[in-house]
Amino acid sequence: MAHSRVPTNWGEDHLLKRLPDARGHASNIRAPGGWIARFDKDGKNWETFAMGFRNTYDMAFNVDGELFAYDSDMEWDAGTPWYRPTRFYHVTSGADFGWRTGTGKWPQWYPDCLPGAYGIGPGSPVGVVAG
């Protein structure tokens, strides 16, 4: 991608050892995790719109053109301090929702990490409709 609306504050400088998920989930995925891009009508000029998602099954726009997404939890993290429930996000330009592999998820108090609009709890989201 030629451009990112999200600050690219991660690096592969090897100053700190990488700590992938001990169970091996997404061990080949590097920060910032899942992302949403936007591009022109010809499918060119891609740019990162938002990132830091774990596994967004579905998203939809409301009548005002605002984007909403439903992101799933990591079921085997349930009961741990870093567990994140299934969440509904209001996706804004330049947002980073902080999902990282393993225990490296950004806490919601990080200034660069947007919280979910609503926490649903354990589950697997499908079928978002907005209007």
Over which residues does each language-model region extend?
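Beta-propeller domains with acidic blade repeats across secreted/periplasmic ectodomains
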Residues: M1-G131
